């Protein structure tokens, strides 16, 4: 059930962060948004997050650095990376870090849902 799935969104772009959070809530997901990787790492949401959506390029820790930091702490969660600057090298690094999806901004609702369904083990 979607309402049981907490999706954490980490993006320094306020409009993207709010739009993604609003979309997920409208689809029945619990969603919480953070403006930086550091803010997410300090939060109580880590242990409850079913899927992480993280911007690749952010000030401070990047989304990929966030994924490595979580792994170093022994925290494993499906991660979907989003980026306004799609580059093959970045995509490869994201997938190596364990990404279940890599989307270029702007992405479609359908693309995001497909990645989420895969991350959460849902079938459509």
Regions found by a protein language model. Name each.
Residues 89, 107-117:
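C-terminal output helix
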Residues 33-51:
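Acidic, metal-coordinating helix/loop segments flanking the phosphotransfer/catalytic sites
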């Amino acid at each position: 059930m979607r309402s049981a799935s907490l999706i954490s969104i980490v993006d320094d772009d306020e409009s993207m962060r709010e739009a993604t959070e609003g979309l997920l809530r409208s689809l029945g997901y619990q969603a919480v948004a953070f403006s930086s990787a550091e803010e997410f790492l300090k939060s109580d949401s880590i242990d409850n997050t079913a899927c992480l959506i993280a911007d690749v390029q952010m000030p401070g820790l990047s989304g990929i650095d966030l994924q490595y930091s979580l792994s170093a702490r022994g925290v494993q969660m499906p991660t979907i990376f989003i980026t306004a600057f799609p580059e093959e090298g970045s995509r490869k690094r994201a997938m190596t870090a364990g990404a279940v999806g890599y989307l270029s901004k702007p992405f479609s609702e359908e693309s995001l849902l497909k990645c989420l369904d895969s991350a959460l083990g849902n079938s459509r």
